[in-house]
Amino acid sequence: MTDSSYDAQAVRSWLQGLQTHIADTLGAFDGTPFATDAWQRAPGEKLRGGGYTRILEGGKFFERAGIGFSDVAGDALPGSASAARPQLAGRGFEAMGVSLVLHPHNPHCPTVHMNVRLLIATKPGEEPVFWFGGGMDLTPYYGYEEDARHFHRTCRDALQPYGADLYPSFKRWCDEYFFLKHRNEARGIGGIFFDDFSAPGFDQSFAMLKSVGDAFLKAYLPIVEKRRNIPYGQAERDFQAYRRGRYVEFNLVFDRGTLFGLQSGGRTESILMSMPPVVNWRYNWHPEPGTPEARLYSDFLVPREWV
């Protein structure tokens, strides 16, 4: 995070194009176009800037799908962003990124999350400090080993040109990050996660970010194309809703992006578009041994080397 030379406009343009491309592709896949909600912070608010929320609810395939682009600036970096960098506490900042969460109707199709972002911390009289963050992770309700391997293989291939050490490092970081400490349980089968990334310099760091963002559709679409027509009943939907509860718990208790948005005075509707539309909790519930639901816990919600 020492290189202060960066091109925010290049990142902004790529992020906007990425959002449009993913929304157009997923809208065609579903058969339902995404609605667009353009928003702008009013003068005098805590944050300056705006963004576009692309949202699809009640589609043929997606129960809820949100793809957000935001580009905001503020006068003081929130605690969730400066906890690991106390020297940056209180600096002004600009944050831009694309974040998406997709919740299919079919429980045999996994929920997926992807995020790519740039943060810039500023202070009068000092050089700006920039860093990239992001990743993607998969949350199945019914596990398929070939799907997990495909997802991780695509993540690995996206990172390979930028260093053989990146995938193992980002994969391990993802396993540690998307973990519900109060449940002692993983949220899903992981993927890749990274933050504070700028050591190779702006050009190489940005190229790596673009490779991750551009790999998303290749990682996810082949999985749901294969699973979208698998029959399911109410029991599978009930289990899906139960497991979605873990998604809600993680996002509200641990997720840095959610906490950053809420702490910085971000736009609540856009921040919480990641929430699943139908969720339930059951008291002290455990799946019956030997069932596909039990196999999710024993075979998938444990750290594994998928590639």
Curated annotation (Swiss-Prot):
Keywords tagged on the record: Cytoplasm, Heme biosynthesis, Metal-binding, Oxidoreductase, Porphyrin biosynthesis
Highest taxon listed in the record's lineage: Bacteria
Sites where the protein binds substrate: S99, N115, V116, R117, G265, G266, R267
Membrane-spanning residues: none
A GO CC term assigned to this protein in UniProt: cytoplasm
One GO BP annotation of this record: protoporphyrinogen IX biosynthetic process
Molecular function as annotated in GO: coproporphyrinogen oxidase activity; metal ion binding; protein homodimerization activity
Known pathway: Porphyrin-containing compound metabolism; protoporphyrin-IX biosynthesis; protoporphyrinogen-IX from coproporphyrinogen-III (O2 route): step 1/1
Record function comment: Involved in the heme biosynthesis. Catalyzes the aerobic oxidative decarboxylation of propionate groups of rings A and B of coproporphyrinogen-III to yield the vinyl groups in protoporphyrinogen-IX.
Name of the molecule in the record: Oxygen-dependent coproporphyrinogen-III oxidase
